[in-house]
Amino acid sequence: MSKSRNTFIRASDFVKKFDPEFLRYYFASKLSNTIEDIDLNFEDFRKKINSDLIGKVINLLSRSVSFIKNNDYKLAINLSDENHYQNFVSRTENILKELHLRKYSSATKEIMKLADEANTFFNDNAPWKLDKDKDKKIIQEISTQAINYYKIIITCLLYTSDAADDV
């Protein structure tokens, strides 16, 4: 950032336009356990937030909740694929290790891999293709599993603490 090149922004101005949680995520995605400068490039910032947080994480929640809504917002007791879920959960251990070692960029990449996998799970199971009356239980289980994936992902995003508190 440079004041002379007009790429400077004050924190007070930034929070008027953007959620500070987005900036935390952006910086975390750039931070490693080495000392390096981080440039706040607004085009890169916009792309990363739109692609990662909105396109992957928020979209997963939005799509899965829309099916739960049709069931009076009740989650299923069982998941549609318990083995897939357990494998998903086990991968968070590596993310926690990366975070502990301050390898935030690496951890963020792994979290986004989980988000991709969660979205693939939801797309592959395609609850929108099932009969909403005949397959109601299956739709509820698929959607519940996707919501649980969302909770894991958002909890891993420690640096988006306000969002994690909402879960």
What is each of the regions a protein language model found here?
Residues 57, 111, 162:
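Residue-level signal for inorganic ion chemistry
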Residues 92-105:
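Long, non-coiled-coil amphipathic alpha-helical linker/lever segments
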Residues 104-110, 114:
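C-terminal structural cap/anchor segments
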Residues 114, 140-158:
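An amphipathic alpha-helical micro-motif enriched in hydrophobic residues
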Residues 98-101, 134-144:
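Short, contiguous acidic/charged loop-to-helix segments that flank catalytic cores in large enzymes
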Residues 61-95, 115-136:
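Conserved, charged catalytic cores of large soluble enzymes
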Residues 1-82:
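Catalytic adenosine-cofactor/nucleotide-binding cores of aminoacyl-tRNA synthetases and other
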Residues 159-166:
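Conserved small/polar residues in nucleotide/adenosyl-binding loops
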